[in-house]
Amino acid sequence: GESSGDCRSNLLKINACYYTPSDGVLIPTGEKRAVKNTPFDFTAQKKIGGGFNAKELLATHGYDHNYILNGEHAAHAESEVTGVKMDVFTDMPCLQFYTGGQLGGVNGKSGKYNRWAGFCLEPQFCPDSINKQDFEKPVLNKDEEKSHYIKFNFAWN
């Protein structure tokens, strides 16, 4: 929660076996890579900051990556410090996971938010999917209607 330290000690599980690697300006390359045995593997709950020293995370100072979801229970996060738990449910195809690596003294409620002051779990279409053949397109044609849902459940001890 707010003013409870940075996000690296929080626990996270993401329901995804693949992520989309990015180029030098964080645009996905169009390929899918398996998360297994990489710093991107959150298929079992683990600490967010455990892989921050991996070479794949140096450019982003942590995570700013898109995951291809396996199902509607997209993610589970919890803080061992505060006891707050969060579950994310969605019918969107992907989830962007961002750990605030680009933050640097942003003004906030309790002062400055520095790098890793929090994290985001953002259900979405795959970035640049309009230009990638194998990804669902975020296109709505004339006279079409479409809806998606995103649900965040919170609990605490």
Label the model's feature ranges:
Residues 1-157:
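An exposed, glycine/acidic-rich loop-and-rim segment of catalytic or binding clefts
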